[in-house]
Amino acid sequence: MDKRLNAICGDAIEELSKLENGIVDLIVTDPPYNLNKNYGTSQDKLEFEEYLEFSRTWLNEAKRVLKPDGTIYVFMGMKYISYIYTILEQELGMTFNSWITWFYTQGIGKTKGFSPRHDDILMFTKNPKKFFFDLDSIRVPQKYYRSVNNMRGANPGNVWEFSHMHYCNKNRKKHPTQKPDRKSTRLN
């Protein structure tokens, strides 16, 4: 198996348009959540329909470059996750596989309402039966010892508890929405 990893950083629509059809095995993407955050280069606030059209455009390009057995993981906050799901399944005809909840202990402080403590990750594939998923590489220790069944470890499930990459963490880079490495290794 070819284990090359090519990370492409840049404007998704622009960079994806440079790629040929059907050449990418895996896409892991963390698009803007459209929450009016300033990330230094642009404001993250589009009108509702404009944001959905932006999402349709880059998701269509992502599907185009995926191999027939390719997989896409999309990180998204709660405000637009259902719309992204609908675009992928209903408009682009991709196959839903998993809805992962990333639970973290440090949330955004709020005085009116509950503090957000999770983000969502959607897993979609182009083919419902033929796609790569290496469960053995991401197993977690069994909670209870059993001498039967799968002692190699358990499926980690779809609720993942990982802390944010805190701003004072020595491994923190300059990316404004950096994800913890341990979480990213589960996306295969």
Positions of PLM-derived features:
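Core catalytic lobe of class I
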Residues: 1-186
